Amino acid sequence: VVVLAAAVLFVCYWRQSLTQPISSDGAANALQAWDMLHGNLLLHGWLLSDVSFYTTELPQYMLIEAIRGLGPGVVNLAAAMTYTLLVLLAGLLAKGDAGGREGRARFLLAAGIVLAPQLSATSTLLQAPDHTGTAVALLVVWLVIDRARPRWLVPVAVCVLLAWIMVADSIVLLTGIVPIAVAAGARAARALAKRAEPDWHELSLAAAAILAGVFGVMAPLIIRAAGGYTTAPVPGHIVGLDRLPGAARVTFHAALNIFGANVVAAHSALELAFAVLHLAGAALAAWAACL
């Protein structure tokens, strides 16, 4: 049943992806993967954007191109595959170790919240790589932490996975590495205060996250020193408080887009109806974050 549902979702996401033209970003990613597939594994001579996707989406593109060749359809297929995995992994993580009706309810609730990406968000979620693949890889990390028994292999796997992701997308520093280090460190400190002895598993997870950040920073530098690709960092600067309302509005709309609940961006009555329906999912996620 799960395999059939995944196949149906994949086809639906692929069809939705086809409604938008391929951007130059997606075309560049396809060409990078094609170059890697033909021997230029370090992407010598390439100047990439601030997010390289070198260890996440580019290997995925290579796999698809090895099967069907180079073409614009690679972007659509990869995006559909990525979003299908996102839905399934979100459901599995929410299910936890629950079984029976509770397990199914938890799976369906989490998967249902992210099930139907809004049409206005197609170019973000179902086109060229835009952190969605990073979210898929990060869900795998959460699953390892959640499901695996506490043993030395767990922090090792977490460190390797987080470093692997960070090579592709440094946003994982904010969405994965720092949260794990802080949460695991806090739990270890609480255990030390209660039992007068450290929780070595939590301490090792915090250390694994910190080491992953170091490795994730060093790896692209090593690749560059070996003659591989270079990246163009995003210029950043501190803005005044007068820019805060506009930035907050953009952030709010982006969050609604993730849940398919951006009522402002709806272009038709049907899309508006779905957006209003998805507001319930966004509200549930906000409520869970506050617990």
Describe the role of every protein-language-model region.
Residues A189, L203-A280:
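Membrane-lumen/periplasm interface segments of specific transmembrane helices
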Residues L41, P59-M81, L86, A98-G99, ...:
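Juxtamembrane segments of multi-pass membrane glycosylation machinery
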Residues L153-P179:
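Membrane-interface alpha helices of multi-pass inner-membrane proteins
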Residues V2-A5, L77-R101, V140, A283-C290:
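Transmembrane-helix motifs of polytopic, lipid-linked glycan transferases
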Residues L88, A184-K194, S268-L291:
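Hydrophobic, aromatic-rich transmembrane alpha-helices
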Residues A28-D35, L47-L70, R249-A265:
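Short hydrophobic/aromatic helix or loop-helix immediately within or flanking a transmembrane segment
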Residues I22, D50, Y54, D97-D146, ...:
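Membrane-interface micro-motifs in multi-pass membrane enzymes
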Residues A7-L43, M62-A66:
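Extracytoplasmic loop-helix module adjacent to an early transmembrane segment
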